[in-house]
């Protein structure tokens, strides 16, 4: 029998090698799926933050329109003060005055209604505070439960100390 330099040469892959490669590939796919899920949560959080900024500007513009509708300084101050609250408004106010109607529209748009989806989040709350009433400088704040990025755990936030996101816009009317 003649001597062969390579009596047995393996060809192809063994079943064990194929199974290990499939396992590594599956773990990689699970990692990609997790990464995509986190990316979608971050994109949703970004959308909510943008909507909250637009919403804060909306109430400040409504205040500006109401205040500028009169030339009487006393009436201007009274109108502006009607928007102000130190507490978070998490439900729509009732009433027939222009400030209450504006606040109702603002809260309803942020939280959504039975016929309209929420602009920000169903847990959204808002408030307007006076920074300097003499110069008509006010701050509009929007607070909501942002599970992807809420980091404000102050006991005075709209969720009573649970992690929340608060967007704040200050403007002079």
Model-derived regions: residue spans:
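Aliphatic-rich helix starts adjacent to a transmembrane/signal segment
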Residues: 2-57
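Flexible, low-complexity segments enriched in proline/glycine/serine and punctuated by aromatic residues
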Residues: 41-46, 50-173
